[in-house]
Amino acid sequence: MNPNNQDLRTRFIFDDMPVRGLHVRLEEVWRHIVSRKQYPAAIRRALGELLAAGALLSSNLKLEGTLIMQVQGQGRLKMLVVEATSNQTCRATARWDETAQIGGNETLRDLLGENGVFVITVQPQDGEPWQGVVPLEGGSIAEMLTHYMLRSEQLETHITLAADGDTASGLLLQRLPEETLDEDAWAHVTALADTVTAEELLKLDAQHLLYRLFHETPPRVFEPETLEFACTCSRGKVSDMLLMLGGEEVSSIVAEEGSISVDCDFCNEKYVFDETDVNALFGADVVNAVREEQHRLQ
């Protein structure tokens, strides 16, 4: 492992109580994501927090696959999307009303408006996906996920998240299922976690942060895992999407515009298909038929 790598996820466990934890700190991954779009500060912060949360929760994937987390709303912010895989890769993007005024202090609920929802999908590499959709509870990504984990997973969880323009970080504590834990002990360890500041979460690595919080009852810390940005878009996937649209619609666009282009929301890669490409997808007969029909109607 590269000793200078700052995109790390670190597991830890307390030997004297049934509590496990995770710390994640993303620098290069996060900078790669925010360099692709000019995110308003409040949306950038919310997306970074969801990215850190996805990196934390994807560690629980028991099969090869992808965890997809979406926050959807009807306000100025339309959607946050994070995908994190069992191969320790992740990507993220957001959609918002680019004509709206968005500053740096708006809360998640301010941005989403009424009737926000949280959608979580587990997409195994082999097998059927599982999806849960719940109303948005809480005013932040951390509060939303805490409610979700308790209600849907029956796991008592404490999550702290932070993000700025350079770093996205998170800390998770979780009671081990089917283990007895004194309520005072859980209250104590979560109270210690509550003392962390956003600045500490963003600036300190796992070793220093865990010592700062839990030096009286130090946890056992495991070897960190390296996380990377990776986008799964491809020309082949865009071709499949165009095939689903149908030859008539795609050929009509190409006949009018000269080509059809599709941009990846996650990495901004542009895929351009001209008449030759569309001929290869649908056959020259389909394209020529559309062109002849357009000439007839003119």
What spans do the regions from the language model cover?
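Cys/His-clustered metal-coordination modules, chiefly Zn-binding fingers
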Residues: 194-298
